[in-house]
Amino acid sequence: MRSWHIAFFGLLILALLVADVHFSGNDTEFSRYNYNWNGTSQFYDDAGSEIITDYSNLYGRKNSTLLMIEPDGKFTSSEITALMRFLRDGNKIFISDEPGNSNTLLGILGTGLSVTPANLSSTDSEYNNKRFIICYPYKEDGITAGVESVALNSPSVAEGGISLMRSSFLSWIDTNGNGKADATEPLGKRSVMVRDEAGQVYLLSDSSLFINRMYGYKRLRDNDRFIQNIMGLSDNLLVEYRHSAAASADGLSGILGALKSTDFIKISVIIIVTLLTILALAGRDK
């Protein structure tokens, strides 16, 4: 076999590998690299926002909102300092958190907000699923403008601050998981979204809003409008990508994720196609 044949097929194999990297992913919940139903790939592809991995990049920001999806709560003192300065500069933080991992951070920031992990259920639900509950705006705020109802999947309870969104009266904390409101489980409205008194920190006790299955279904209540409001809280949307579950990609998945950037794929394709063309023309002339 001639040398140009070897080079040609070698580049062809490389092109296939690049395509495989681009379309591969993982199955980690909320991961940006998870293209399955429980990933957040669709939201991140559409958001097109600046990714924050180094908290020093928060300094000097104006009129910006930092979005944190399921943060792990393992913040360093320098990161907390950066967040405090970020808020002092008049910016906003939106946190979606079901298990309550952000409670320590919320306390340090002095927000008075927290998440109480709970099996919040309701007969006012979508698809006759008591865990797929419908929630309603409770007080006026820009984040709920044009929103009449939102469907959330297995939310917890948001506490403190000003309640902005609640479940209906036909809701209860299903402590025993039997899907029924027992005598020891009183009915009542529960908050699923709150904000601090300063109007700078928002807390949503559910992150399913951003997963592919729900985000991709544009006709699900007013979920799409709600997400657009979140993204439009400020002129600039920044997406936290150091502690958020969206960044979950260990080992090879993390490497593949880094290679999946649009610029890398475009440059790789251009180079490979150019070389393949040159080799093909060179081989034809021989």
Predicted segments with their positions:
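Short, surface-exposed patches at the edges or C-terminal ends of soluble domains, predominantly
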Residues: M1-K286
